[in-house]
């Protein structure tokens, strides 16, 4: 999102060690931000397996997003119930679709909702697109960044539970920095070409090694760069924020 992104020396070493350990994952965006937005809403507070099932059931039951928008909410609930919190997520999805419809009508657009959202994001910078998504009902900073990164290959860095925890332990950010604040910090220090691989590798590391409880420090490739075990001094490595 920023014009100039300068990683700290500590982050450079962390990035290189993560790549050595987990490789350099490549993004394969589908350029369907509306599908990605709905999918991200469905993924909240559930497993990938359950959210994928809910998404497939939703698009099988309702062929278009206009159909989802116009359907009785209880029918949406029925379609996505396998993903959990269906009563909440159904309303959020329809609220987003109705808001996009209102914007579309105000502009006199006749494209599909999927095309409308794609065009709205395409004509904006990454930062502007992130702010635009944040203004949609129920869309937080992580959801907005996920859509931009995964679906459009934009350099927006989502901060999920794993990324937040691992980043604090490594000393990339301060221990009191919230996930919302971390979005802005990573925006300043992560080069665009690093965004996707760093995000994916931090999640991988959080799932495999740096668990919330009983992290496997004796198996950690980042042991030499970790504030949690005292290998680095947080005051010298964290970015102010």
Residue ranges of model-derived segments:
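Catalytic cores of DNA base-excision repair glycosylases
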Residues: 3-240
């Amino acid at each position: 999102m920023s014009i100039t992104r300068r990683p700290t020396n500590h982050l450079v070493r962390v990035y290189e060690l993560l790549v050595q350990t987990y490789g350099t994952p490549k993004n394969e965006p589908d350029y369907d931000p509306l599908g990605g937005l709905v999918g991200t809403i469905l993924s909240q507070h559930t497993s990938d397996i359950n959210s994928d099932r809910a998404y497939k059931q939703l698009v099988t039951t309702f062929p278009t997003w206009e159909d989802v928008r116009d359907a009785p909410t209880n029918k949406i609930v029925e379609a996505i119930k396998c993903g959990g919190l269906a009563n909440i997520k159904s309303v959020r999805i329809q609220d987003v679709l109705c808001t996009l419809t209102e914007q579309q009508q105000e502009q006199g657009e006749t494209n599909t909702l999927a095309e409308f959202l794609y065009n709205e994001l395409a004509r904006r910078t990454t930062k502007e697109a992130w702010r635009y998504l944040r203004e949609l009902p129920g869309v937080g900073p992580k959801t907005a960044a996920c859509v931009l990164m995964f679906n459009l290959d934009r350099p927006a860095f989502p901060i999920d539970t794993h990324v937040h925890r691992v980043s604090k332990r490594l000393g990339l950010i301060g221990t009191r920095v919230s996930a919302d604040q971390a979005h802005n910090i990573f925006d300043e220090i992560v080069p665009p070409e690093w965004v996707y691989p760093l995000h994916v590798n931090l999640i991988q590391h959080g799932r495999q090694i740096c668990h919330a409880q009983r992290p496997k420090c004796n198996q950690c490739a980042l042991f030499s760069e970790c504030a949690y075990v005292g290998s680095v001094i947080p005051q010298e490595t964290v970015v102010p924020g």
